[in-house]
Amino acid sequence: MRRQPPFLLAVVAILLAILVPAVWKVVERLNRPVGPTTGGEPWPGDEPVWHTRHAEFIADSQNGGYDVVCLGDSLTWGWDDHRDVWAERVTRRRTTFHAIGGETTNGLLWRIDHGELDGLDPKLVVLLIGSNNRWVKDDPDDIAGGVAAVVGRLRERLPRANVLLLGLLPQGWTADASSRPVFAEVNRRLAAFDSGPVSVRDVGGCLLEPDGRLSQATSTDGTHLSRGGYERLADALGPLVRERVGD
């Protein structure tokens, strides 16, 4: 049998040394999950703005001195544009809003696990999270389980704080919108968490018309709130927050 030239064997060896690890990296990447499998699994967001805001919130937490910390998704983020409404109708106590558009329980868990609450010692945490989980896993048990995981993490990280857990707010213009029964089931499950320092309140009815519709008086797109929506929400939240932290 003819022997291969030494230089050819050397080239083959070099190619194998380069290609085999690369192939294994591809295989490993293909075997990795592309997202969380349950609502209680910490998982970071994949958008640059998500990581930017997380870093901003870490820096904000180092300032400390907040009486109220509000955590959530775009519905909580919207308070940034209506801080005057919050101050006039909810409380003038020092409040910060740590919220990211499109956030899920997974992302919020990851943020908590990676320093976002470090330096904070609030009297109250207002939590509104879970509606975006529906786009990951449309299952009330899983969504409620994710919210429960967040509440548990808050109790671990901020043991002196009370938690005001809000039920998912209604979405969809009409009373028969597909999200309504899912959110109603989630809220029924969340009610079971009402105990001790954790208070659960379903205030979403304040946003609806008598026939169950969302209207442009409270919503901009059937999901997010208009100024009128934040005013109604503030009137519902005001007594709950002031009872826990004062005016």
Short names for language-model regions:
Residues V68-C70, R94-A99, L124-I129, N162-G167, ...:
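Structural recognition of the beta-strand scaffold that forms the well-ordered cores
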Residues C70, A99, E103, G107, ...:
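Extracytoplasmic/secreted proteins, especially bacterial periplasmic and envelope-associated proteins
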Residues P36-G45, D80, F97-T105, W135, ...:
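Acidic/histidine-rich helix-loop elements
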Residues T96-H98, N133-P140, A175-A177, S219-H224:
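Second-shell loop/turn segments in exported
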Residues M1-L71, T76-H82, R242-D247:
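N-terminal secretory targeting modules
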Residues P170-D247:
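Catalytic His-Asp segment of secreted/periplasmic serine-dependent ester chemistry enzymes
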Residues W77-T91, N106-A148, R153, L164, ...:
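Oxyanion-hole/transition-state-stabilizing segment in secreted/luminal serine hydrolases
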Residues L158-L165, G204, L237:
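A non-catalytic structural micro-motif
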